[in-house]
Amino acid sequence: MRIRIALTAACVLLLAACGPKWQETEADGFKLVNQKGGATLGYTSAPLLTVDRYAFKDLNRNGALDPYEDWRLPADTRAKDLAAQLSIEEIAGLMLYSGHQAVRGPEITDPQKKFLKEDNLRAVLVTTVESPETAARWNNNVQAFVEALGHGIPANNSSDPRNETAATAEFNLGSGGKISLWPTTLGLAATFDPAIVEQFGQIASEEYRALGIATALSPQIDLATEPRWSRFNGTFGEDPDLDTDMARAYVDGFQTTPDAKDGWGLKSVNAMVKHWPSGGPEEAGRDAHFNYGKFAVYPGGAFETHLKAFTEGAFKLNGGTKRATAVMPYYTISYGIDPSGDNVGNNFSKYIITDLLREKFGYDGVVCTDWGVTNDNRAIEAFDGKCWGVEGLSVAERHYEVIKAGVDQLGGNNDKGPVLKAYQMYVRDFGEAAARARFEASAVRLLLNSFRTGLFENPYVEPAASAATVGKPEFMQAGYEAQLKSVVMVKNHGKALPEIPGQAGNDGKKKVFVPERYFPQTPGMFGLSMGAPGHWDYPVDKALVEKYYDWAVEPEEADFALVIIEEPKAGSGYDVNDRKKGGNGYVPISLQYRPYKAEYARKESIAGGDPKEDFMNRSYLGKTVTTYNEKDLDLVMLTKKQMGSKPVVVVVRATRPVVLSELEPYADAVLIAFGVQNQAVMDLVSGAVEPSGLLPMQLPADMRTVEEQKEDVPHDMRPLVDADGNTWDFAYGLNWSGVINDARTAKYRK
């Protein structure tokens, strides 16, 4: 009997030793395979193979384990194997990057099915999502759809930055939200703390993966040396050293999975750094989303300075992933930089992409164009194609030029047709073997980013886990703390702040007067449309204010006033009406509140020329512009008059350097807020938190110094000096004790 029992036990052990090392469970909408010492697999329709007792997905359904299906092999081995198996039609699909896709429900739309199936597209740009759970279910439906196609290549979903807050959002300790809320990139720079930026990357990447997103179209590390540029807000400011450190921290945070081999794991998100070689030095601040802003200029000869955040930051990480996996060139023509004299948009420039990025700096990651560079441009002011310097070519020819320049992927293009035409042009000029090798090289780079992030093993996400992860309380708190650290106090005359509220229900509780602000009708993003009609309203919710102070209806009742305004807003540098009246259409971009006449502008622009213009000079010398929100200055002046000797605290919501010399004499305290909740402002004003932010850029004394600075040179303006003798320069900020001097200022202040 004992012998029989022993034999039975031995058989059980033998079967266990010889049986599979994995087990399968049903997840919400997909199957999950967990295995001891092996990769976790998620799938819906692909057959499973068992090799050496481990499970593998037979993605191409050929009944054999291909190297690209073998999760035990290095990512580059797998990518090369799969790329070699793909047809040119399939590779053409990998080279596409979708237009913006809003996720309003879990189902895949018919246009999405078309570009996924017929065009073989696998890189999808996700914009708004209805909820984390909806995003998860949509992702799972997309992944199930593409798993059943061809080689089973998963979708690599991506996102532009999605963690910026609204002023009216409220933070409640212990409560969650739809996603963690952080200051703008410029606000993160104002913390002067790369550790905060890395923490943001770690948290945001975890939220992204919970939404089914594996690529971030960020960070924007353009060196913002031109103060009038509308995209200044998305950068880390104007200092090369700070920009470099923040770029490195951001990418490390996004790409690194803690304790994972080589840094890559299921919490990793590919970072697509932008914009090479910098969109910062736009002539006169006009943005290259439009024809009128297509030139980046270098009057100070500082081209190399703009590369540092890439070459010394994003390409030299502290973490195991080593470098950012993708780069996006900007729309601009880097005027006069190519030694050959060829002035074309960066995405079309062999010098910018191959000679510099790939050969000089050794970058072999993905290069993806900015969105819409191969499309036609209909008018100087039109928001459509951005084919700068190659306007005379066809759409297919532009695709060919981009590929010859060294680019791998075409942003905003859903149609493989022009890519296939470009392939035939390559065959015509260089032969079939060279064309195949060139396209296959791009396929390898593109596939690597999906293999490294584990998408081939499990691209699915649990909807319930997504809802629990995105915006969970500890993430919300970290974002809110970063907001508090991003606000910069630039003036505190007579220690007007903090305004300690006192205790509720006690006679010592202070009263605050918050004047209504006029919200003017202003153009939307990139000037595409006008916003809501102009109206008067309070800039902060009364209920929020009353958590700190009593609400004063009239200024004479108040102990102090709190005025919350926007920076001066004055257009994009081009006016169709000026052109209709016989001008060239080019006008100043003002950073001051009062009407501005450009008396110190260049007589001759540095760059110019377009097939749709019969002149070269884009100067606006002598022209005058007004701001949409001049009433903000009037409001500050009126409030100061009403308050008499009582303190007036002004909060300026800023996105770039602004001229505040008109406002400064009428404010006792000034706070600069870079995309933070009003609650953060109230916590600072009330003294609940001490301000610690520093200016990530200079605040200019006047528009003359703005006109006379060189677009490509950092720190070359004359900063404002206030009534207390403080200079509002880079790395300046106040706390309750006065001017901040600490380890951050010692490291970065010039």
Give residue spans per PLM region.
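Positively charged n-region of N-terminal signal peptides that target proteins for export
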Residues: 1-4
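Bacterial N-terminal signal peptides
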Residues: 6-16
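Glycoside hydrolase catalytic-domain context in secreted enzymes
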Residues: 18-750
